[in-house]
From Swiss-Prot:
Assembly and oligomerization: Part of the 30S ribosomal subunit.
Origin species: Sinorhizobium medicae (strain WSM419) (Ensifer medicae)
Protein name, UniProt field: Small ribosomal subunit protein uS17
Function: One of the primary rRNA binding proteins, it binds specifically to the 5'-end of 16S ribosomal RNA.
GO cellular component: cytosolic small ribosomal subunit
Sequence similarity: Belongs to the universal ribosomal protein uS17 family.
An example molecular function term from Gene Ontology annotations: structural constituent of ribosome
HAMAP family assigned to the protein according to its UniProt record, in alphabetical order: Ribosomal_uS17_B (MF_01345_B)
Keywords: Ribonucleoprotein, Ribosomal protein, RNA-binding, rRNA-binding
Biological process terms in GO annotation: translation
Top-rank taxon, per record: Bacteria
Keyword RNA-binding assigned: yes
Amino acid sequence: MPKRILQGTVVSDKNDKTVVVRVERRFAHPILQKTVRRSKKYKAHDESNQFKVGDLVSIEECAPISKDKRWTVVSAQS
């Protein structure tokens, strides 16, 4: 099974080697028939502490690193 890759924005970099990335998804509401925005936050591994708040990044699924971390930052988006 291929690893999932998501794009999002770094919202916190206060932890060592960890960033919190907010990933937004859009979908059509089944009853209201309008586009709805929902977001979810993922903790991702950042080995070199190079990503800062506001950066657009890609995260990739990986084996569990800690209790909450199952994603790693792959690259920055431009």
